[in-house]
Amino acid sequence: MPNVFQNLVSCKRVFRELKMAAYNGGTSAAAAGHHHHHHHHLPHLPPPHLHHHHHPQHHLHPGSAAAVHPVQQHTSSAAAAAAAAAAAAAMLNPGQQQPYFPSPAPGQAPGPAAAAPAQVQAAAAATVKAHHHQHSHHPQQQLDIEPDRPIGYGAFGVVWSVTDPRDGKRVALKKMPNVFQNLVSCKRVFRELKMLCFFKHDNVLSALDILQPPHIDYFEEIYVVTELMQSDLHKIIVSPQPLSSDHVKVFLYQILRGLKYLHSAGILHRDIKPGNLLVNSNCVLKICDFGLARVEELDESRHMTQEVVTQYYRAPEILMGSRHYSNAIDIWSVGCIFAELLGRRILFQAQSPIQQLDLITDLLGTPSLEAMRTACEGAKAHILRGPHKQPSLPVLYTLSSQATHEAVHLLCRMLVFDPSKRISAKDALAHPYLDEGRLRYHTCMCKCCFSTSTGRVYTSDFEPVTNPKFDDTFEKNLSSVRQVKEIIHQFILEQQKGNRVPLCINPQSAAFKSFISSTVAQPSEMPPSPLVWE
C-alpha cells in the first residue's frame, strides 16, 4: 500500500481497508481481496442471489433496508460510532466521520470527472466547526455538509459524494446551478425537484433531503441529497466484467419496474440511457436524472420539444421529427440498452441523426406509411427516396450466446418502429424472459419483501404503480422568475418540516469552493440538437 501517509484522506482510507481486511479475514482471504478490488475498479457485480443477506463481507448499500448487518454493527469500531455520535452532537465536519460503507479511493472517483485535487481532499477531511448561516431559519440547529468528490454530471447539474453528518452515511449531493436565469430554467428545475420529492419507488432515484436554502435574496442554487450509488450501467457495460444472463435479466427487470411506475405517474423520462441507470454494489438499479422528464401530453395538437434523448437511444419517431410522442420513446431506449447488455456494444452507433435512422431501418426494414404517420414530410421523403429494405431481425441472435429465443422475442417487441405497436413497460414485465429476474430481485434484493425464520414473505404487488398521477398543473400559473423563486423557496422549507435537523453547506470549506466552481454537464453529455428536416 504505497503513499499511505500523504494526507489525512489516504491515511483514513488505508486504515479502514486494513481494518476491513482484518475483519473479513475471519470469513475468507478471498473476501478481503474482493473488498480491495472494490476500491480500484468498478464495483464487481456480485451474482444477485441469496447469500447477500448472510455474508457481512458483501458491502450492503447504506440506504438498503438491512443497511448495517447486526454483525457488522458489532464489529465496526466503537470509536467510529462514538465519533459519529459526537460529530452529530457537536456539529463537526462530516468529513471526519467513518461510515461503514467504504468509499472509492481518491483518484478512482467514478464518473467522467477526475477526483478532486489532493489539497481539496485534505481540506474536506480537515475539521471545520459548524458555520451558522447568517440568513438561516434555524441557526441553532443546523449541520454542515461537505462535498468531497465529483462523481458525475447530469443533463442539468453536478453530483458529488458527501457524508451526512447526522448519521455518517455516504450520500450523493446534486447541485442544480443557475436555477433562476430565466423562466424556462426555473420551471424545469422546479419540475425536477417536485418529481424527486414525489417519487416513492425502489428503482427510481428520489430526494432524501434538500439542503436548507439561505434567505431568498441569496438563493441561487439548489442542493438535493439522494442515495449514493456505486456505478451505472454505462460503466458496467464498457468494463471487462463478465455479465451473466442473470445479471441482464435482473437489470432489465428493474429498469422496466421503475419505468412502469414512472409511466403510471404520467411521466416520460425522455433521456433513458445506460449512464442514467445507477447501480449499487448489490446490483440494485435506480433510474436517475429527471432534468429532461415531463408529464405526458395527451392532447395530440400540443407540440412537444424534440431536444430529448441522447442520439443512440433516440426513438425513430423523434428522429423523424414527430411533434407528438408518447412514453413509448422510453421503451425504445430500453430496447437499445437491452441489446447493449447482451452484445456489450451500442446497438445503433451512428454519427448523425440521419445515419441513426438509416441504421434502424437496416435492422427493422423500411417502415410502412402507417408506421410513419406522425413523421414530418422531409423525414418520410428521406425514407421513401432510399432503397426498400427487408427486416434483418434474426441478426439479433448474433449479439451473444445470451441472445436466446425468449430474449430476442422480447427485444423485438421493444424495437418496433410504430410507437403505437411497441410493447408497454407493464406488458414487458409479464414476458416470460423476465420471470427469473423477478424471482431473483424479490428473493434477495428488494426492500418490499422480507425474510422470516420460516421463509420469505412476499409483497402483494411486485411491480407497483402510483396513484394519483404526478400533477404538473402548477406550471401553468408560473409567470415570473421572482414568483417561481419564492414558490421553490417555500416548497423546500415545507419539505423539511418535521424532518431531521436541517443540513446546510459550509461555504468556508475548500471542498465547497471547488464544488461551487465545478462545471455543469460536459459538452459530450448534452443531448445533441434535433435534426431539422427540410
Curated annotation (Swiss-Prot):
Q: What is the catalytic activity of this protein?
A: L-seryl-[protein] + ATP = O-phospho-L-seryl-[protein] + ADP + H(+); L-threonyl-[protein] + ATP = O-phospho-L-threonyl-[protein] + ADP + H(+)
Motif TQE in this chain: 305-307
Q: Name the cofactor(s) required for activity, per the record.
A: Mg(2+)
- Residues covered by region (Disordered): 29-79, 97-147
PTM statement from Swiss-Prot or TrEMBL? Phosphorylated on Thr-305. Intermolecular autophosphorylation on Thr-305 activates the enzyme.
Q: Active-site residues?
A: 271
Biased-composition ranges for Low complexity? 110-126
Q: What is its EC number?
A: 2.7.11.24
Protein kinase domain segment(s): 145-434
Recorded hits in InterPro entries, A to Z, give: Kinase-like_dom_sf, MAP_kinase, MAP_kinase_CS, Prot_kinase_dom, Protein_kinase_ATP_BS, Ser/Thr_kinase_AS
Q: What does this protein do?
A: Serine/threonine-protein kinase that regulates a number of transcription factors with key roles in cell fate determination. Positive effector of the non-canonical Wnt signaling pathway, acting downstream of WNT5A, MAP3K7/TAK1 and HIPK2. Negative regulator of the canonical Wnt/beta-catenin signaling pathway. Binds to and phosphorylates TCF7L2/TCF4 and LEF1, promoting the dissociation of the TCF7L2/LEF1/beta-catenin complex from DNA, as well as the ubiquitination and subsequent proteolysis of LEF1.
Question: What's the protein called, per UniProt?
Answer: Serine/threonine-protein kinase NLK
Species whose genome carries this gene: Bos taurus (Bovine)
